[in-house]
Amino acid sequence: MDDKQHTSSSDDERAEIATSNQDQETNSSKRVHLKRWQFISILIGTILITAVITVVAYIFINQKISGLNKTDQSNLNKIENVYKILNSDYYKKQDSDKLSKAAIDGMVKELKDPYSEYLTKEQTKSFNEGVSGDFVGIGAEMQKKNDQIMVTSPMKGSPAERAGIRPKDVITKVNGKSIKGKALDEVVKDVRGKENTEVTLTVQRGSEEKDVKIKREKIHVKSVEYKKKGKVGVITINKFQNDTSGELKDAVLKAHKDGLKKIVLDLRNNPGGLLDEAVKMANIFIDKGKTVVKLEKGKDTEAIQTSNDALKEAKDMDISILVNEGSASASEVFTGALKDYNKAKVYGSKTFGKGVVQTTREFKDGSLLKYTEMKWLTPDGHYIHGKGIKPDVTIDTPKYQSLNVIPNTKTFKVGDDDKNIKTIKIGLSALGYKVDNESTQFDKALENQVKAFQQANKLEVTGEFNKETNNKFTELLVEKANKHDDVLDKLINILK
């Protein structure tokens, strides 16, 4: 068994699964945070990221594998005996791998810890891709729109771009097989494969349809984006993966080259990731020998400190950090450190509040056990678990950008009373329709506005909020949020 401590971020499909209208399993609530390309997958796919942080390279002090006492040995023997009995004597033949997994799942479930889990070999592969930012594919962002799989954009320099794939190309077949009715994640799985193998996409561009052969390659998805907005540099950090610190350093240097003194570090909806990357990133702004985070297990505490001098180009910069309730884990470690040392002012809304650390142990068969091992505190000793980090200046997110996903399996009509109806009203109001209340009642006034929405969008006019109406409703809200980042605009106005 390979015992190592590294990250667990989201099961984010990244470059080849940008958006989806399919209902997918979530780990917690179904609250949605809309934010540029990041939030598209979250809103339409109903995928919420359970924020997880684990440690790379920090072996906790005095960690030892202890021998089993008599009770532990007795329990272990009992588990082994039950496994043997069921595997050999049960009247129906059993799958030994499934029995083993069920036993492990049962132990993990008993922890009642949302951050501890056992991953199969396949799940571990996806998990590790999330850590590294690397996967094998063609490098094309996709979304499901109007029941079609459409390319949002090919990544620069990717196999997809070199093969001539363009934005708005509609994929109709993969390797000659129709993808009609398939969920986006199923299509992504078909498109991906082994390195140096070929995949043939049938793409529709206008009235033309053609086959495009693309060689799969290892793709790296960057976790940092830099944009200049007037006299402010906006650096968006999507997750904490391998070399995010290097990408952040490059972005800061670009901002310095552009002559910018005011920098916004946008951590909204960043679920976290590698702890050592958070420490390295904090070191860009915090001098050598300073504590970035404290790890605590029982009575033992270890302070993780910066090892280098701060980046000289960053020393005179006015740093602002933008967060929301989707900013979690390593995002909170980074934010907490800069806040405690007065290196940055924090804006937005209260963060998620995850103050525990997971360790992973990988087994020879490729499966992996992830479990909570310790908690962490900010340099000043603040334990933010379940509390989050409060911003210095609150900038509220517009209601429509924090809506719960409405299940598209449900239809709502006059006389219904449901919490999702309030979501419908808030969304329609944001889209410019006249809604006079935000109750959970589906009244005649709402029916009239739903009819107006259906007519305006060339849908069957029924007055009922059905699947087709829901899909268009969601699509338009995403487009609105994509075009108007109200929170960021407010912050930039504050910084002027």
Curated annotation (Swiss-Prot):
Domain PDZ: 124-206
Compartments it resides in: Cell membrane
InterPro entries, per database record: ClpP/crotonase-like_dom_sf, CtpA/B_N, PDZ, PDZ_6, PDZ_sf, Peptidase_S41A, Peptidoglycan-bd-like, PGBD-like_sf
Major site of localization recorded for this protein: membrane
A Pfam family recorded for this sequence: CtpB_N-like
Enzyme Commission number(s) from the entry: 3.4.21.-
Domain of life: Bacteria
Polar residues composition-biased segments: 18-27
Record's keyword annotation contains Membrane: yes
Keywords tagged on the record: Cell membrane, Hydrolase, Membrane, Protease, Serine protease, Transmembrane, Transmembrane helix
Topology class, membrane: Single-pass membrane protein
Residues spanning the membrane: 39-59
Active site: S329 (charge relay system), D340 (charge relay system), K354 (charge relay system)
Gene Ontology CC terms, in alphabetical order: outer membrane-bounded periplasmic space; plasma membrane
Example GO BP: proteolysis
Biased composition (Basic and acidic residues): 1-16
Protein name per UniProt: Probable CtpA-like serine protease
PROSITE patterns: PDZ (PS50106)
Enzyme class: hydrolase
Similarity field: Belongs to the peptidase S41A family.
Gene Ontology molecular function, alphabetical: endopeptidase activity; serine-type peptidase activity
Region Disordered, residue ranges: 1-27
